[in-house]
C-alpha cells in the first residue's frame, strides 16, 4: 500500500477483516483495487484512539497502523 500522501508524523490506519485479512475501505467495503484504503491521522495517539474505538464496536475488524514510510507501527484487535 502506498502512503506517500502522508506527511512526516502522520499515521495511516488500515482496517481489514480479521478472519480473512482482506483490506477494507474506510466505509467498511472490501477494498479490491482501491487507491486509498486507509484513514490518515496527525498523530499516533489519534490513530490509536480511532482504531481502538473501531475494533471495540466491530470485533471482526483489525487495524494496522503505519507511518509515512510504510513502516508497520502496531496492530490493534478487539480484546473481546
Predicted segments with their positions:
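Short aromatic-glycine-(Arg/Gly/Cys) micro-motifs in beta-strand/loop hairpins
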Residues: 2-36, 64-68
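A short, charged, amphipathic alpha-helix used as a generic interaction element across diverse proteins
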Residues: 30-33, 38-62
Amino acid at each position: 500500500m502506498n502512503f506517500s500522501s502522508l506527511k512526516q508524523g502522520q499515521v495511516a490506519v488500515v482496517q481489514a477483516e480479521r478472519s480473512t485479512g482482506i483490506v477494507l475501505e474506510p466505509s467498511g467495503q472490501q477494498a479490491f483495487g482501491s487507491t486509498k484504503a486507509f484513514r490518515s491521522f496527525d498523530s499516533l495517539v489519534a490513530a490509536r484512539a480511532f482504531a481502538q474505538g473501531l475494533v471495540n464496536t466491530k470485533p471482526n475488524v483489525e487495524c494496522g497502523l503505519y507511518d509515512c514510510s510504510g513502516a508497520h507501527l502496531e496492530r490493534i484487535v478487539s480484546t473481546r
